[in-house]
Design a protein with these regions (language model features):
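Short linear S-[DN]-x-LW-Φ motif typified by the pepsin-like aspartic protease active-site region
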Residues: 16, 26-27
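Non-catalytic architectural context of zinc metalloproteases
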Residues: 8, 28-37, 41-198
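Early extracytoplasmic/domain-onset interaction patches
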Residues: 1-21
Length: 199
């Protein structure tokens, strides 16, 4: 993961947070252990940082004079077995949950933090999300600028095997599967879903 965070002139310390209160969870359960190899840069200069000893989801980064942005680089280690947590990535499918693989600056309402998301998918994969303004260049996908709150509420489903049904009313059903034969749906089931949209 690579994330660029602008900094105001004169900033000497930037605190970045990994979300701990996640949509659909009833407690502070952000997957901190899945964030590894965390590094920060201003240009080519590697920056010093430390994790807060009390607020463990906070990372304090020392910002050099004149820096206009800080680049965070890290790896999100998705669970490989169900005993490690929900499996969200396989060789054929992806459920990209932004809140588990992004940081945000402390001291701001998340609905006011502007972001421009970009993802590079494996060749031939198709993405689906509630984000607006999708454009593709090869296997690189970019969406229109949005706020961090909307980003977190807009996971991406993508996969090698993908199918989409128009349910009417500007509503689509997007399906990804491990195998192409698993993409099928009975016409009567699609009709029921279309009826729900009409209701």
């Amino acid at each position: 993961m690579t994330q660029t965070v602008p900094v105001a002139p004169g900033t000497t310390r930037l605190t970045l947070l990994l979300p701990q209160w996640l949509p659909g969870n009833h407690g502070p359960r952000g997957p901190l252990a899945e964030l590894v190899d965390l590094q920060f840069f201003a240009g080519s200069q590697k920056l010093t940082w430390k994790r807060d000893p009390v607020e463990v989801y906070a990372f304090h980064v020392d910002v050099p004079a004149g820096a206009k942005e800080v680049v965070a680089k890290f790896i999100h280690t998705s669970p490989l077995q169900s005993t490690e947590g929900r499996i969200t990535m396989t060789q054929e499918m992806l459920n990209l949950q932004w809140e588990k693989m992004s940081l945000y600056p402390a001291g701001h309402y998340v609905r006011r933090i502007r972001v421009k998301p970009t993802v590079t998918l494996p060749q031939g994969w198709t993405p689906a999300t509630a984000l607006d303004g999708m454009s593709m260049s090869g296997n690189r996908v970019t969406w229109a600028e949005t706020d961090y709150e909307t980003l977190v509420d807009s996971p991406i489903f993508a996969g090698k095997y993908f199918r989409q049904w128009d349910l009417g009313g500007k509503t689509t059903l997007n399906v990804v599967a491990d195998e192409p034969e698993l993409l099928g749906a009975r016409p009567e089931n699609i009709a029921k879903l279309s009826a729900l949209v009409e209701e």
